[in-house]
Amino acid sequence: GDIGAHFRQAIGDLRHIHIWPENHTRNPAYEANIESLKTILENEGYAVTIGILDVEEGLPVSTQGAIPDLILLNNDLTSGPLPDLGVPILPPPQMGWYQRRKSDHFKAAQPLLDEVANLLDIDPWLLSTHWVVSEDKCLEKETCRTLLAAEVDNFLNHIQAKYDEFGIEGKPTLFVKNDSGTYGLGILEIQSGEELLNLSNRKMNRLTYGKGGTDAENFLIQEGVPSGLSWDSMVVEPVAYCANGRVGGWFYRANAKKGEMANLNSPSSIFISPSEIDDDSIRSRRNHWHMLVAEIAMLAMAAEAKN
């Protein structure tokens, strides 16, 4: 399959792959995902082991007592970089969230989105989102937050003009989130600068709490995009699995307790296989627009890694 071909192209001949997962295992869906990945790789003919390795000891040793040919990272490395393990690692560990920033990804993606929009003769806004970064703990400083609130209102007015231009109903929403890391707890939805000015201590604490207890300092303030898809009375959004720059598989995140402008990644979300959703319009969007944006994101990630 695509994943096996990708590994053979990147690494060459290999037989033993070790999956390095996240440290926490409280999420049953995450555990199921890791087991599915293991099964996919085993079906490709690889010996597969799973576990956090003690990198203090030098070369990693698997549970079978052998050094793997490849370490497959399924850990975002928020806690810090890995030492030189003497074993090939994919994805590249320098893409870990100890130094990566979401805003860097969107900077890398924008020229690609502009180019594709030009080829399709459409407004680039239809493929992308507007965003700004708040630096240096600005949200904790009253003067800085006041200036940022005014910028947020201008931001929302600009998006409202786009809504009016394209006949989009609803009120624009912005998401405020840590510019580093993948932790989903501290994501805030706002629809006015005043909401930013009047943040409660509870919301501020959630926003600034990073994975592993590290404090968030820089925040990405980004235009929210309506999910636009529904199935069985639930809002749904596609999630793509990609390898070697191509989409290799999908699933859907669905949430009966959230609206189309909300963050669906919450404890009430469920995951649905594409085979369970018999809807031509959802399938068509997934195979065209969603696949296009996902593969542009892969190109942007390659540009990030190069830089």
Walk through the language-model features, giving the residues of each.
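Short, flexible beta-strand-to-coil junctions
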Residues: 23, 74-77, 178-181, 244-245
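Amphipathic, soluble alpha/beta structural segments
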Residues: 124, 138-149, 232-234, 240-254, ...
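Short C-terminal domain-edge/linker segments immediately following a structured domain
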Residues: 49-53, 102-105, 120-124, 204-209, ...
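Phosphate-binding site of ATP-dependent enzymes
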Residues: 154-160, 166-173, 180, 185, ...
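C-terminal active-site "lid" helix and adjoining low-complexity regulatory extension at the edge
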Residues: 246, 253-307
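A glycine-rich phosphate-binding loop feature that marks nucleotide/adenosyl-phosphate handling sites
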Residues: 128-132, 172, 177-179
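Conserved N-proximal alpha/beta basic substrate-recognition cap immediately N-terminal to
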Residues: 1-168
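Short amphipathic alpha-helical segments
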Residues: 33, 151, 195, 284-293
